[in-house]
Amino acid sequence: MPGMKRTMSSECLLPYYTAHSYRSMGVFNTSMGNLQRQLYKGGEYDIFKYAPMFESDFIQISKRGEVIDVHNRVRMVTVCIASTSPVLPLPDVMLLARPAKVCEEHARRARFIKGKGCKPSKTLELTRLLPLKFVKISVHDHEKQQLRLKLATGRTFYLQLCPSSDAREDLFCYWEKLVYLLRPPMTNCISNSTLPTGETSVDTKSTLVSEIRGEGDQNSRPQSSPTVSEATSAAFAGGERTQPAAAAAVTPVSAKARAAGTAGAAAGTAGAAAGTAGPAAGPAAGTAGPAAGTAGAAAGTAGAAAGTAGATAGTAGATAGMAGATAGTAAETAGTAAETAGAARAAGGPMAAAVAAPSAGMTKAETATSPTSGVISLAATTTKPPGSGQVAAAMIGSAAKDQVGGESSKAMALAANITLENVDVALAGAANSISESPPAGGDASGSPDTGLNVAFAGSIKTKSPAEDKPEAPLVSTLQSEGYMCERDGSQKVSQTSSEAKEKRERREKDRTSSRKSSHHRRTGMSRHSSKDKSRKTSSYRSVSGKTREDKGKGHGRLRGKRHSSSHKSESRTGHKTRKNRSPAGLGSVSKRATKITSFFRSFLVRPTPKAGDTSCDRGGVDIVTKLVEKKQDIEAVMEKSKDSEFKDTVISETMEKIILETKSI
């Protein structure tokens, strides 16, 4: 009897004893449930004999809240949350049990003793033992007292609380509290997992794994978990498991990894610094202008050019940012140096100086920080006196050097703009260099690890001499305005009355000579072969067509060296015949052929500066297009014999289009 009393007392005090000094004592400080009592008496699972447990009965439902019937019976399930060892701060195992099948004999026996008040004892069958690191418990519906269980395989179950008649009313509130303990908010999760202590360390199975697994239903695809290899819990190790380590350990990041992440931002900062130094050089040059005397205006112009170079440097900085992001070198040190320079400027550390030289027209502005920061900024503009030509140069630069431990870095940004008489050059670049010395414990012969990142952008604009000169007149206007085009160029001569008389006389002579030559050519047409006819007819037709157009307009083409060649032609055409003339265009061609002219050439250049200017404003692609037209009219006279003459007119027209294209990097 004493032993029986001791057993009953220990059995009743079992939950209180195991939940003493437990973190969730308020939840587990309850009386024994059916499953816990069965595990305590059965002895099959000694690990759960004195383990604190919290259990309740549920019915399985669908996601919509409908009851799932199996063989016209409600499917009951007992859910138990247990801890395999009192040392653990939180429970780590979930047990699932269902009512066991009653034997037929036991059922028959129950029919006979139905009215006598003797009921068969209800037994449970333990079906599942799941570590809580692979289960995510959440509240599905608070009003209907429904829970949601999601396993690591992706399957999801919905359970509705089905308490007994003698259960407490706030039973579901305890389940909500337990869910909160197992799945704390994200802030608590981070603070508990990253800063574990001996008393309040949180097992990572219930914090981080839940964030890795997604939401899904029963048919969702199984999702892998990084902790699947740790499926064995304290339940299988007899509760003798060491405390878990931190959820996320902070690993040291090398300088190269940090540089790869911030290379774009650092290069952009260098470009912005160069752009800021560019406009600053403009006011400095303007201030030094009055002191420079005659070079003051040129210095102001150079200051504006420096501002333009600064804007170009900003564009180059963006390009350098993209190049730096892909290079993955130590550009982060350049950003650190830029921040140090900004702090030094805010503290009043940097020193500024401006120097002006009146004779050379040079303005220089420097900014240097304290020796500890190692940041230097430079802006300079240089112009030559007006008598020596239009030459202007502007340069903006910034250099930084930093050394932290065994790492040393150098960063430099430079922008320059040079303007000459016919060439305008804008350059911008950024360079970053980092070197890491080998560790002290490493090999002494190892060379330091160095990295270099360079970004460069530039544009060149060439001004052709034709832009300064007036545009040459068109060929159609040369005749009326009296232009004489030679190989060297074109010049305008005044038409006098004597020249007009000479032209009239020449026209009359040409008409008379053409009539005579046409008569002789008709008599000599039978001497030529059919092959020569087919070969010459096309060229003669083209010449005759142009002659008609010129005659219809009333303008005759002017050609040099007319006097000497005209008399020779008149003396010869009377005795020689014409070859290969078609009957249709014979009369007009003969009139045209008798006009003997010299070489005519027109070289016309039409630049399109608008396309180049707009591209320069964009800072992208500079395109200079030149259209070159070459028209050559050649009339040659060749003598073969005394009785025959070969005369032909060759007209060649060539069009050349030259495109100079420069693309920025």
From Swiss-Prot:
Residues 211-240, 272-296, 480-590 are annotated as: Disordered. The modification Phosphoserine is found at residue 652. One of its GO terms (biological process) is cell morphogenesis. Expressed in adult spermatocytes and spermatids. The keyword Cell membrane does not apply. Residues 219-232 have a biased composition (Polar residues). One of its GO terms (cellular component) is Cajal body. Transmembrane segments: none annotated. It comes from the Eukaryota. Keywords: Golgi apparatus, Nucleus, Phosphoprotein. Residues 499-513 have a biased composition (Basic and acidic residues). A motif (Bipartite nuclear localization signal) lies at residues 515-531. It is found in: Golgi apparatus; Nucleus, Cajal body. InterPro entries: GARIL-like_Rab2B-bd. Residues 514-538, 554-566 have a biased composition (Basic residues). Belongs to the GARIN family. May be involved in RNA biogenesis. Interacts (via N-terminus) with RAB2B (in GTP-bound form). Interacts with FRG1. This is Golgi-associated RAB2B interactor protein 3. The lineage of its organism: Eukaryota, Metazoa, Chordata, Craniata, Vertebrata. The gene is Garin3.
